[in-house]
Amino acid sequence: MTAETALTVANLRKVFVTKHNAVVEAIAGVSLTIARGEVLAILGPSGCGKSSLLRVLAGLDEDYEGTIDWSLRQAPQDRLLGATVFQADSTMPWMTVEKNLRIGLSGLRLSPETIEQRVAENLSLVGLGDFRRAYPHELSGGMRQRVAIARALATHPLLLLMDEPLAALDAQTRIVMQQELTKIWQRTHSTVVYVTHDIAEAVTLADRVLVMTSRPGRIKAIRSVPFGRDRDVFAMRREAAFRELEADLWAMVRDA
C-alpha cells in the first residue's frame, strides 16, 4: 500500500426525506482518507448507512453535505477509473455472459486479443468458464453475481466499490473468491472500498477495517489488519492475531 491519497472525505452528511416528510439522518459527519492501493472494508449494524456511503462515493447520489476530494482523476487507456459491484443483479439479461463482460471493456483501448484474454481469465476466476454463452436467466442468483464481479474485475479499475458482492455465494465459493480477490488486488493495486456484514471477510480482505455506528452512521473506529497483502486466507484464519481482531471488531459492531 502506498501513502499517496486516493480520496479524502470531509464532514459527509446524508439526509433522507421519507414519503411522510420525516427527515432521517443516514450519515453524520464522516471524515476519512483512503490511500491509493488500499483495501478498506466497512462494517456496521444494518441500516447504519454503509450502502448510502458507498453510493455517494460512487457518484450515484449527489444529494449530500460535505466534500469528497478525488485524487484519482484519470486512468490509463487500458483501465477503468472506477467500477462498482452491488448486491442487486446488474447483469444485462439480453446478453450472454461473455457479452456482459465485453460491454464492460468496450470503452477501453484494448486489442481484440487482450479483450479475449480478460474475458476468459475473469470468467475462469469466478468459475464460469463453461458458461460464457449462457444467458443470465439460465444462471442462479449467485452465478449472476459472479458475472457482475468478473465484469468489474476485467476492467482493472483504479477504484473498485463493492457492496456485499459475495453475499449470494455459497460458503465454499465465497472463501475461494476471497483468496482470488486478494491475489488480484495485489497485482492490480486497485483502491477498494468493500462493504460487508461478514467480520471474518473484512479481516481477510482488507488493509484497514472501518466500523460505523448505528444510524446516523458515524465512524466508531478504524482498525489496521496485521497481515501483508500476500496472504493465505486459509492459513491466516488460524492465526491468533486474526481471531483477536475478529473478536474486537465483533464487540464494536455489537455495541455500535
Which sequence ranges carry the predicted segments?
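Conserved signature/switch motifs of ABC ATPase nucleotide-binding domains
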Residues: 134-137, 155
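Conserved ABC ATPase "signature" region
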Residues: 102, 113-131, 183
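Short coil-to-helix segment of the ABC ATPase nucleotide-binding domain corresponding to the Q-loop/switch region
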Residues: 95-103
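Catalytic Walker B motif of ABC-type/P-loop ATPase nucleotide-binding domains
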Residues: 160-163
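Helix-to-loop junction immediately C-terminal to a conserved catalytic motif
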Residues: 58
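The feature captures the beta-strand-to-loop junction immediately N-terminal to the Walker
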Residues: 43-45
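Conserved ABC transporter NBD signature motif
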Residues: 66-78
